């Protein structure tokens, strides 16, 4: 049943890609500007294209190469090309948690929150201990106004990584929507419980 639900998520993502050029980008989400590829990245892209076009590959091998090329596109800010490769990869091999994680982030940026939740759910089905996916799903739930569920995810993230300033900050922002007084008290307690405050992220927490 879980594999079946992931299949329909893949279908939704692929068909969403076909219409993404017609989507309006929300004004509060900055547009990514593609970076100029370095020589090494250009060579790697050419090599990956040659392998994908000419080599006899198993589905697993092709999916892994598409994933690697998608990550390279993503690092260059080429989201449409990256998402296309990720979508092809999970059609071939729908059990790569990292691909669902990337797609979930894209879907949040596009405002497709329900599908983003499903993408992060798929990551956690494949890797139940993946706390990064729990963090990302919590942030997506925050943007969707589902604050109680978002709090559950960020509390679990905090329990496993209490020294992470961004987990503390997002937990505060979520709880601020629920009860401002409780959020302020909890933020102070978590800040004081952290050791050292050496990570630069704590400087952001200081502003709150």
What would you call each of these model-derived segments?
Residues 71, 105, 139, 173-175:
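Residue-level recognition of tetratricopeptide repeat
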Residues 75, 109-110, 143-144, 177:
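Register position in tetratricopeptide repeats
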Residues 20-68, 76:
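N-terminal leader/linker segments that initiate helical-solenoid repeat arrays
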């Amino acid at each position: 049943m879980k594999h079946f639900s992931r299949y329909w998520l893949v279908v939704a993502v692929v068909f969403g890609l076909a219409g993404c050029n017609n989507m309006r980008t929300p004004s509060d989400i900055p547009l990514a500007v593609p970076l100029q590829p370095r020589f090494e990245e250009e060579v790697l892209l050419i090599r990956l294209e040659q392998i994908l076009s000419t080599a006899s590959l198993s589905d697993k091998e092709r999916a892994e190469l598409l994933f690697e090329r998608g990550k390279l596109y993503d690092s260059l800010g080429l989201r449409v090309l990256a998402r296309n490769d990720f979508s092809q990869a999970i059609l071939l091999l729908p059990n790569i948690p990292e691909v669902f994680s990337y797609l979930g982030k894209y879907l949040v940026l596009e405002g497709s929150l329900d599908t983003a939740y499903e993408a992060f759910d798929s990551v956690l089905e494949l890797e139940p201990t993946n706390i990064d996916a729990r963090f990302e799903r919590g942030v997506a739930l925050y943007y969707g106004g589902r604050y109680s569920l978002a709090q559950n995810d960020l509390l679990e993230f905090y329990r496993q990584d209490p020294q992470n300033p961004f987990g503390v900050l997002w937990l505060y922002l979520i709880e601020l929507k629920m009860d401002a007084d409780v959020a302020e008290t909890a933020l102070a307690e978590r800040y004081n419980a952290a050791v050292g405050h050496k990570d630069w992220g704590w400087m952001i927490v200081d502003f709150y």
